[in-house]
UniProtKB/Swiss-Prot annotation:
Disulfide bonds: none annotated. This is Nitrosourea synthase. Binds 3 Fe(2+) ions per subunit. Two Fe(2+) bind the HO-like central domain and one Fe(2+) binds the C-terminal cupin domain. The gene is sznF. Keywords: Antibiotic biosynthesis, Iron, Metal-binding, Monooxygenase, Oxidoreductase. It comes from the Bacteria. Its cofactor is Fe(2+).
């Protein structure tokens, strides 16, 4: 043993990490799209590889910057890496998409993804280390008291999402945008959870598998929860093929879904998943009851809410099962030392839910405000000409059909059209037509894109930081 070389843990950072990310994302299936939607092709995901060489992946953002563009880019990357473990086929069949199928599941694509995954996870979830503290001495009794103190039943007050949708200028548009955010999770429901039912760890494993069986409709496809969600989407005029609306997924929606893949993929975080499982199953009862009422208020009797009403019953059972049949036996078997991780999983998930509520509410407000933000162009542009803000400017010339796939900026920007016509996209079903001399204020962290609708469009992007300083 004296001649054994020293062990060097794997680590990727700096230029080597950036190059590895670019190598992964330049796979042709990850290139920009010529359309806002993906059409029944679960292997194509727009990662905007042309931007990735310019991002810093080493400095973990704090919560205040977690909705910046680099985080969105990382969440899109992680979604693609995680989902290479799952089996996807187009609803219309594989014919004509065989090359994309092979490119997505190839050993090279999967190996490149796994190589960058730990660094991407550090970037995506590292901020939670500063957001959650589980110090002190924990016992089975204090854990029970903590779980009893959690308010999973909800109150009478409207949630931020309910306020955003019901207060929107276009409630149906807002509700569709909301439903689309769940597609990465609900269409492959329980897939992250499946990562934790493999292996050998005693009775709790069998209890967890019972939860999975319920999610999969007891082996009956028509009652599988993802099938129920497809019907919900279709009942409000949306398509149900996987990742059709990829470009409309918000940063926080991918963050929430990826969190469970992160916990499930890294088994050293197993007990965090146990905590997150308990909280999500317990709180989903109130969430689904509210979702049923909300969708019926917006769409009337035409909406199919069976997905949500089914969960009202089943998740009452799952919450009790997670506590009595999974958490309690695991603590008895492995001791109080695992309790801080269980609590951490709950608290981290609660932080992510807060971020998700904020992100979605801000996006709906941004979509509703498009006419006013277009009007703001003139005074903001005048302020720039007067020198109120010394803003960097990008001069762009693009041909007809050039699609700027959805992204966001880390500060406010002003889009100014010099000549030509642009369709400015601010969300699903939300767009402006901008002509020469017009423009729009682009708010920090808000998802948007653009399409050129003239033979040529000349425009400018002014990085103003805070548009109010131009007024």
């Amino acid at each position: 043993m004296s001649h054994v070389p020293p062990h060097v843990p794997f680590e990727l950072s700096g230029a080597e990490l950036r190059d590895a990310i670019v190598q992964y994302a330049t796979n042709p299936i990850y290139h920009d799209n010529l359309d806002w939607l993906n059409h029944d092709n679960p292997y194509r995901r727009q990662l905007r590889p042309q931007v990735l060489p310019h991002l810093d992946y080493d400095k973990v953002p704090g919560r205040e910057n977690i909705l910046n563009y680099a985080s969105l880019a990382v969440q899109r990357l992680l979604t693609s890496v995680y989902e290479a473990d799952l089996v996807f086929f187009p609803k219309s069949g594989l014919k004509g998409k065989e090359e994309d199928f092979r490119a997505f599941y190839s050993p090279a694509n999967r190996a490149l993804g796994e190589r960058i995954r730990p660094a991407l996870e550090r970037y995506a979830f590292g901020f939670l280390d500063d957001e959650v503290e589980t110090s002190g001495t924990w016992t089975a009794q204090s854990l029970d008291a903590y779980l009893d103190s959690l308010d999973t039943a909800g109150g009478a007050e409207q949630s931020p999402v309910e306020k955003a949708i019901l207060g929107s200028a276009d409630r149906e548009r807002a509700a569709r945008m909301w439903l689309v955010q769940f597609a990465p999770d609900f269409l492959s429901e329980a897939s992250p959870m499946m990562r934790n039912v493999l292996g050998y760890y005693g009775p709790a494993q069998s209890e967890w598998f019972k939860v999975v069986i319920d999610e999969y409709g007891y082996g009956v496809h028509d009652t599988k929860h993802s099938t129920l969600f497809e019907r919900t989407l279709e009942s409000v005029g949306l398509e149900s093929d996987l990742h059709r609306y990829w470009q409309y997924y918000l940063n926080s929606s991918l963050l929430l879904n990826n969190y469970f893949h992160y916990l499930g993929k890294n088994h050293e975080l197993f007990f965090r998943y146990v905590g997150a499982l308990y909280y999500t199953e317990s709180s989903l009862v109130d969430f689904c009851r509210r979702a049923d009422h909300l969708l019926r208020e917006v769409f009337g009797d035409t909406v199919d809410t069976t997905y949500f009403t089914e969960h009202i019953h089943i998740d009452q059972h799952h919450g009790r099962m997670a506590r009595e049949k999974i958490i309690k036996p695991l603590v008895e078997a492995h001791g109080d030392g695992i309790i801080p991780e269980i609590v951490r999983g709950i608290e981290e998930y609660r932080v992510l839910l807060e971020i998700g509520d904020f992100d979605f509410s801000e996006q709906i407000a941004w979509m509703d405000a498009q006419p006013e933000l277009k009007k703001l162009h003139d005074p903001v542009f005048e302020g720039l000409k007067q020198g109120k803000v010394d803003a960097p400017v990008a001069h762009l010339v693009e041909p007809r059909g050039e699609l700027s796939n959805t992204h966001c900026h880390d500060g406010d920007e002003l889009c100014h059209i010099v000549s030509g016509t642009m369709r400015f996209e601010s969300g699903l079903g939300s767009s402006l037509t901008l002509q020469a001399g017009e423009g729009v204020v682009i708010k920090r962290n808000r998802l948007h894109g653009a399409n050129i609708e003239s033979d040529e469009c000349v425009y400018e992007i002014h990085s103003v930081g805070d548009y109010r300083k131009c007024l």
